[in-house]
C-alpha cells in the first residue's frame, strides 16, 4: 500500500496546528519538540499573534472553568420522564442537550410536531377529518415540492390513519375513556439521596374499566424500543410513578371545557419515600411512525407497590443531573453508528476522535 503524506500547511493557523500536534505527540523527537515550542512562542509573542499559538488558548491544558453543581444542594432536581433514559445512558448527552448545544429541529421533526398537534386538538376525529386538517395545515411546514414532499405527506396521512384506528379501538375494544390531553404534572419524589421533581406532560390520559389512569405517549419516529425493553422502559415507568402519586386524578380534575385540556400550571404533588398513593393502570407507547400498517401499541403493565426500581431510576437520574461532571458513555461502535445509534455529541465527546482534546490525540 502506497503511503501518502499529508499536504504541507499553507497558512500560519494550519502551521500552528501542526506544531501543536508535534509538541504534544509522545513519539516526537526531542529536537523537533524544542523547535516546535520555539516557533509557537514566536507566533504567540509576535506583534500580530497567531490565534491558537499561546498555551492559554489550548483548551486541553486549561483548568476547568467551574466545578459548581447545576442545582442547589437543597433543591429538588427537575427530571423529565423523556430525559431519564438519556442521562442514564450518557450523562454528557443529557447535559449537552440541556445546554441547547445539539442540532436544531429539522423538517421531519416538524412533521411529527404537526401530527401531535392535530391529534391533540382532534382526539376523537375520524381519519377523514384528521387528514383534511393535515392538508389544510401542510403548507405551514415548508416542505419542498415534488417527490420528497409528497412522500412526507403520505407518511403523515398514514400516521393519522393509525391514530384514528387507535382512538377507535381504545373505546370499543379496550373500554377505556379519554379524560385529558396534554395534561401536565409536577410530582416531588422524595428520596434520602436526592429529591426529584418529576415534571412532564402526557399526550393522552385515559381511564380503564377499573377506574385506573393510563398514560399514552404517541410516537411519530421511525425507531421504536424492542418488546424486551418495554417492561422497564424508563419514560413509561416515570409516568407510572407520577400516577402512583395521584397525578392522574389531578390532571383529570384540572380539565376545563370540552377540549379536555388542563391547566398549564399544575400543582405540585408529593410522593413520600416508600409509599404508593394510587394504583396506576399502566402506560403505553403508540407507534405511529414505523413501517407497519396498523398502530403498534407497546404497553407496560401496571406497577405494583413492591416495584421500587422505577422510583430509583428517577432519583438516580436526579443524582446524575445534579453532579459537577458529566460522563461520556458509549461503545466504540457508536462512533460510526454500526449498531444503529451513533454518538449524539461527537464534537465534545472525549470517546470520539472528533471530540478529543489536542493533549489526548
Predicted features and spans:
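RecB-family 4Fe-4S metal-dependent nuclease core
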Residues: 1-361
